[in-house]
């Protein structure tokens, strides 16, 4: 195990794209598994495979290319540059990734109207993301080396994916919906068995 752990940073430097994409996809998929666990009931591995498919084919790759593009367009870690990167990420990258998630999941689930979830949940989810992602990316752009940025985003996306997958399955894209669900679940777990 120790040798694997030491080899991982070398792989990220030598093969940054596949290493970052696979790590991102694994963490994003784990977020879906966590939200299923929180909801209770049997695990839906087909759903987790769909999330993993979308994370590997789009999200991990998009984030890898997008973060490198931002670094090329706005190089450095000066405060103004970092703020410009965060602004670009939240006004361009965020909406693209969020739209791809809702539409991609609808396609993979075989829904008739692949844009319905996007239409119903985009704005609420985007606003919820604005309470999380600017702070994540502020840290990312100012402290994390370029070759680790997608992996760091994936680590932070673990929490986001938990929320996002819940919203796609049964929420409305607001943080309030998940808190209400968790409160109800806690109350039902505490109620005496009949």
Curated annotation (Swiss-Prot):
Tissue/organ expression: Isoform 1 and isoform 3 are expressed in the kidney (at protein level). Isoform 1 is expressed in the kidney, spleen, heart, brain, lung and liver. Isoform 3 is expressed in the kidney. Isoform 1 and isoform 3 expression increase during development, reache their highest level in adulthood and decrease with aging.
Keywords: Cytoplasm, Membrane, Peroxisome, Transmembrane, Transmembrane helix
Transmembrane segments: 15-34, 51-67, 92-110, 151-168
GO cellular component terms attached to this protein's record: mitochondrion; peroxisomal membrane; peroxisome
This protein's record includes keyword Flavoprotein: no
GO biological process, one term: reactive oxygen species metabolic process
Chain segments carrying region Targeting to peroxisomes: 16-55
A Pfam family reported for this protein in Swiss-Prot or TrEMBL: Mpv17_PMP22
InterPro entries in the record: Mpv17_PMP22
Similarity section: Belongs to the peroxisomal membrane protein PXMP2/4 family.
Protein name, entry field: Mpv17-like protein
Organism, as annotated: Mus musculus
């Amino acid at each position: 195990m120790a040798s694997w752990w030491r080899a991982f940073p070398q792989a990220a430097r030598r093969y940054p794209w596949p290493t970052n994409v696979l790590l991102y996809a694994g963490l994003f998929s784990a977020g879906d598994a966590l939200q299923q666990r929180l909801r209770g009931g049997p695990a839906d591995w087909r759903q987790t495979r769909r999330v993993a498919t979308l994370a590997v084919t789009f999200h991990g790759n998009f984030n890898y290319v997008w973060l490198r593009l931002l670094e090329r367009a706005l190089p450095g870690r000066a405060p103004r540059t970092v703020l410009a990167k965060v602004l670009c990420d939240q006004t361009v990258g965020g909406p693209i990734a969020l739209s791809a998630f809702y539409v991609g999941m609808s396609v993979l689930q075989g829904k008739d109207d692949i844009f319905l979830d996007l239409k119903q949940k985009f704005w609420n989810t985007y606003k919820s993301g604005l309470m999380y992602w600017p702070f994540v990316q502020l840290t990312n752009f100012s402290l994390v080396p370029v070759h680790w940025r997608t992996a760091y985003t994936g680590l932070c996306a673990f929490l986001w994916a938990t929320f996002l997958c819940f919203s796609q399955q049964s929420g409305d894209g607001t943080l309030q919906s998940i808190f209400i669900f968790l409160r109800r679940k806690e109350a039902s777990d505490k109620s005496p068995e009949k």
